[in-house]
Amino acid sequence: MSAGGEHLKDEGTRRQVVLAGGIAGLVSRFCVAPLDVVKIRLQLQIHSLSDPSSHRNVSGPIYKGTISTMRAIIREEGITGLWKGNIPAELMYVCYGGVQFTTYRTTTQALAQLPHRLPQPVESFVAGASAGGLATAATYPLDLLRTRFAAQGTERVYTSLLASVRDIARIEGPAGFFRGCSAAVGQIVPYMGLFFATYESLRPSLATVQDLPFGSGDALAGMIASVLAKTGVFPLDLVRKRLQVQGPTRSRYIHRNIPEYRGVFNTLALILRTQGVRGLYRGLTVSLFKAAPASAVTMWTYEETLRALQAMEVAAQKDE
């Protein structure tokens, strides 16, 4: 897709787009799973790293930075601790990727049929926001399960994926699967809109540049777009994680002192009052480390998979 700078929305059949999007999400998730676990652990940590007095009566671990957190997890929980929550996350990424790319393609094609075309960046923003919002809502229960498993320490809150679904449904009801969903949609809509608008703007010019880092213009455009969009909406991502672990099991995760939060605005206000503005950006560094390669891997895998599927279709037609 890089060659010639054609747009993401113009290529592939619906089946090819769904399959390529799903595979891209699967590969990307597996590669960045350890960084995702580290990010979640840092986001759920409420005590101040610069104030030793806040560490009193803290029964859980005190993480300081990406590398030291990763080492602590390996030391206390083994190497597999870095892939906690990977099963629901893989399911989420596959479904998310398929819904996202299909919705993006469908929306942009619909916008192209309007009597008066919107400016290209506006079309990309609308399509990206629609794709992100729908994909987030459709896969949110899996996102919540991913967070809860990643937040487990050596004491297991849930013994298995099926057990977690059963327990949440029985104790918290259907609404329990959607804790923090409003923050997620509020985060992902502008994030995906900004991501795709930036990505589509950068791709044509980067497609003609030789010897780019990360192998291709698609990957570099995806990385730059992800970093810019992720930084802008990160506080809502942190709020989402804090809300996802609310409920009767709140005190049983790796950080046992997570406060009780009630809604997005209450969570934002409480974090600002007790932890300051910096509290809204805990885990941002590792989030950017994760977001950039994740988006680069996602877009590169999507492009290459789509190209391979199209080549297979052409070859099959020739054999007929």
Swiss-Prot record:
It is found in: Mitochondrion inner membrane. It is a multi-pass membrane protein. InterPro entries: Mit_carrier (IPR002067), Mitochondrial_sb/sol_carrier (IPR018108), Mt_carrier_dom_sf (IPR023395). Solcar repeats lie at residues 12-110, 119-205, 213-308. The keyword Transmembrane applies. The keyword Zinc does not apply. One of its GO terms (biological process) is transmembrane transport. The chain crosses the membrane at residues 17-35, 91-107, 125-145, 180-197, 219-239, 283-300. Keywords: Membrane, Mitochondrion, Mitochondrion inner membrane, Repeat, Transmembrane, Transmembrane helix, Transport. Its main location: mitochondrion. It holds the Pfam family Mito_carr. It comes from the Eukaryota. GO terms for cellular component: mitochondrial inner membrane. SUPFAM superfamilies: Mitochondrial carrier. Mitochondrial transporter that mediates uptake of thiamine pyrophosphate (ThPP) into mitochondria. Belongs to the mitochondrial carrier (TC 2.A.29) family. This is Mitochondrial thiamine pyrophosphate carrier 1. The lineage of its organism: Eukaryota, Fungi, Dikarya, Ascomycota, Pezizomycotina. The gene is tpc1.
